[in-house]
Amino acid sequence: MMRGSTEIDMPESSSVSKGTAPLIAAPMKEKGGYKKGIAIFDFILRLAAIATALAAAASMGTSDETLPFFTQFFQFQASYDDLPTFQFFVIAMAIVAGYLVLSLPFSIVAIVRPHAAGPRLLLIILDTVALTLNTAAGAAAAAIVYLAHNGNSSTNWLAICQQFGDFCQKNSGAVVASFITVVIFVFLLVLSAFALRRH
């Protein structure tokens, strides 16, 4: 130091580096983006499930066939409402399709707010109920469709699908569509559980 100088020299601290700013990572944004992707896929799957559930209900509900030959006293006709199992199937698949339509706003909330656990938890509970109803209706209808195709010799139930081909074809298509809906529901439950697990 020079004599008479009023200047004081202060050495810089070694712990502070010049010209660097701390980097701020944004893990929440990445996590939110990941959950948002799951929510968008959930919404798309719900739209697909609506289509398959409505197709199953419509196919079964319009499955009636009248054979071209008839007698003076009998007209040979097969319709879904002849069997209570098929009536249950149509009602159950209509309920499932209605639930899926009503669940779309909750799926949209999950897209807008991917970190919200409430809508996901509600969807898991209601999806499980809808999956159970869907599986019950599909399994019951599948048993009747099997009997219509193959009959049962032990109880003398004859196969009717050789005569009522269109009726059986529509019923079989409805059962296949219902089981596709079951598979979509399983994917929806896995997605929702996965999103909640990483919450």
Swiss-Prot record:
Main location per the UniProt record: membrane
Q: How does it sit in the membrane?
A: Multi-pass membrane protein
User: TM spans, by residue?
Assistant: 38-58, 88-108, 121-141, 174-194
Query: Can you tell me which residues are glycosylated?
Result: N152
Report the InterPro entries cross-referenced here. Answer: CASP/CASPL, CASP_dom, CASPL
List cellular component terms (GO): Casparian strip; plasma membrane
Listed A to Z, the keywords are: Cell membrane, Cell wall biogenesis/degradation, Glycoprotein, Membrane, Transmembrane, Transmembrane helix
| Ranges per topology, Cytoplasmic | 1-37, 109-120, 195-199
Name a Pfam family for this protein.
Answer: CASP_dom
User: In its UniProt record, which GO terms are filed under biological process?
Assistant: cell wall modification; cell-cell junction assembly
Q: Where located?
A: Cell membrane
Residue ranges in the Extracellular topological domain are 59-87, 142-173
Q: Which family does this protein fall into?
A: Belongs to the Casparian strip membrane proteins (CASP) family.
Q: What does this protein do?
A: Regulates membrane-cell wall junctions and localized cell wall deposition. Required for establishment of the Casparian strip membrane domain (CSD) and the subsequent formation of Casparian strips, a cell wall modification of the root endodermis that determines an apoplastic barrier between the intraorganismal apoplasm and the extraorganismal apoplasm and prevents lateral diffusion.
Oligomer status and interactors: Homodimer and heterodimers.
Name of this protein = Casparian strip membrane protein 2
Species of origin reads: Populus trichocarpa (Western balsam poplar)
